[in-house]
Amino acid sequence: MATSGMVSPTSGRPFSPMRSSVLTTTGSAIKLEHVSEKFAGLWTDLEQEKQARRIAEATRMQLFQESVLRLEKSMEAEVKRRAESDKQLQAHFEGELRVLHERSACQVAEMHNSLKSAIDSFSSRVQDLHAVIREERDQRRNDIEHLATSLVGKVNECVAALDEERTIRMQEQAMALKRFGEDISGVNHRVDTEKAQREADLSGLRVEIHDVLANRNIQDEQFKTVTLDELNAFKAALALEREERVAEDDEIVQAINDYTRALQEGLKMVNMQHNSA
């Protein structure tokens, strides 16, 4: 009877504690249902975002692998092309060396033949000179023997003249031999000089070939180094982005845990209010 006489201060109607408890419980259930719907929607959005991130990461990884494969193929093609170019360059220089060697051999052979011809000609002239001297000596000996009986007084003069003439001829022969020796020495010196020059040219050409091949190897090593540096930088960027994604996922999981903890605490409060009512 005492409870039926209580009046609500807001509506002017009779106030009932049981009715107030029911209304409070219904409002909490509606709020809890609304929170559950929001939680379910948030969970669905998170799952969709995770799926989208997985798809994007898989697509990016596939594009990266394709890019690396194309880069490796282009590197292999470049290495093959440069190797083929080096082979062609080496074959070209070897052909040039072969032509130069053949040309030098031909020139040396021509000089040798010309020198041999000159020596043969000189030998023939010396033999002719010896024949002439021998004939003239025999002739003079015959003349001396023929005139010995009548020209006894002039024998010594004739002998002296012959000795003087012989000396002159021997001096002329010695001078001729000396000139021939000097000519031979000059020809040998020219041959040695030409040979040394050819060998120096061949050595210089070999050094140039070695420098060209060394520069090609250095360029190949530089290209490989730059490519590997770019690949390492790309891998480092990908690892950093992956770490950032993992950190973001951890933050999302932490937020969900906090939200779940708050929801559980709200449910506990509602249950406590319901039990107290």
From Swiss-Prot:
GO terms of molecular function: structural constituent of cytoskeleton
Residue segments, region Nonhelical region: 1-27
Region (Rod): 28-277
Pfam families registered for this protein in UniProt: SF-assemblin
Chief localization: cytoplasm
Keywords, alphabetical: Coiled coil, Cytoplasm, Cytoskeleton, Microtubule
Location of this chain's protein in the cell: Cytoplasm, Cytoskeleton
InterPro entries in alphabetical order: SF_assemblin/giardin_b (IPR008374)
Chain segments annotated as coiled-coil in the UniProt record: 70-90
Assigned GO CC terms: cytoplasm; microtubule
Residue span of region Disordered: 1-20
Function: Major component of the striated microtubule-associated fibers (SMAFs; system-I-fibers).
Domain comment as written in the entry: Consists of a small non-helical N-terminal domain and a rod domain with a 29 residue repeat pattern based on four heptads followed by a skip residue. This alpha-helical protein is characterized by the ability to form a special segmented coiled coil and to assemble into striated fibers of 2 nm protofilaments.
Family statement drawn from the similarity comment of this UniProt entry: Belongs to the SF-assemblin family.
Name of the molecule in the record: SF-assemblin
Organism per entry: Dunaliella bioculata
